[in-house]
């Protein structure tokens, strides 16, 4: 695992974003760990978070004209990433995010920010079953003439490498896009194995 990914994992542990116990996920399944990106809740946190997403976008070599945040947690992610791309990589890119509810007055519509055209990258916090990603992609395609070239998430929390390949390959093939994560559950396992004081948490994720 490269240095900046380790820095991100340290950042997650410092902010207690990665928790262990018993948690019910949106899919209805129970998980022994939970990634709560809502705990990145200060200006300093968002500056750091934006850098890690921006770095992942740069490393991905994806072709894009705008970045899109999936409401609600994707909203601060996409804004901080747009700022980080400009600050750290001198890339001035427009952003957009969706509303959960259709607005019928003022600017109206389903989206806020740049009008969705051309190739975009989707930003979200986690991926488990892929159901949320499927819903978001279908929603965007039903409301905008655009092409999603890739998806960037903070954590791929798929339980094992076989599942990861299946879920990602299915989505990538279905929508002709690429999925990248800042870290995966396998990165966390390998990192914890190297840190004695973190061995206690391995029982939750292996």
From Swiss-Prot:
Gene Ontology terms describing biological process: 'de novo' pyrimidine nucleobase biosynthetic process; 'de novo' UMP biosynthetic process; pyrimidine ribonucleoside biosynthetic process
Annotated disulfide bonds: none
Residues that coordinate or bind orotate: 128, 157
Any one GO cellular component localisation term in the record: cytoplasm
Pathway: Pyrimidine metabolism; UMP biosynthesis via de novo pathway; UMP from orotate: step 1/2
TM spans (from-to): none
Keyword Magnesium included in the entry's annotation: yes
Function according to Swiss-Prot or TrEMBL: Catalyzes the transfer of a ribosyl phosphate group from 5-phosphoribose 1-diphosphate to orotate, leading to the formation of orotidine monophosphate (OMP).
Subunit and interaction comment: Homodimer.
Protein name: Orotate phosphoribosyltransferase
Gene: pyrE
């Amino acid at each position: 695992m490269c240095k900046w990914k380790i820095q991100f994992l340290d950042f997650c542990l410092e902010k207690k974003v990665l928790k262990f116990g018993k948690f019910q996920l949106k899919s209805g399944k129970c998980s022994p760990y939970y990634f709560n990106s809502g705990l990145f809740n200060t200006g300093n946190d968002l500056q750091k978070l934006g850098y890690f997403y921006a770095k992942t976008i740069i490393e991905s070599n994806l072709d894009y004209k705008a970045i899109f945040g999936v409401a609600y947690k994707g909203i601060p992610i996409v804004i901080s990433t747009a700022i980080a791309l400009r600050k750290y990589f001198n890339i001035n890119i427009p952003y957009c995010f969706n509303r959960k509810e259709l607005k019928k007055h003022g600017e109206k519509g389903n989206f806020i920010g740049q009008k969705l055209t051309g190739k975009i990258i989707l930003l979200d916090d986690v991926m488990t079953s892929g159901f949320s990603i499927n819903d978001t992609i279908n929603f965007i395609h039903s409301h905008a003439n655009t092409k999603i070239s890739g998806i960037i998430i903070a954590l791929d929390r798929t339980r094992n490498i076989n599942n990861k390949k299946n879920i990602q390959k299915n989505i990538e093939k279905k929508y002709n896009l690429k999925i990248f994560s800042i870290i995966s559950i396998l990165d966390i396992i390998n990192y914890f194995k190297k840190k004695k004081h973190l061995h206690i948490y391995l029982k939750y994720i292996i």
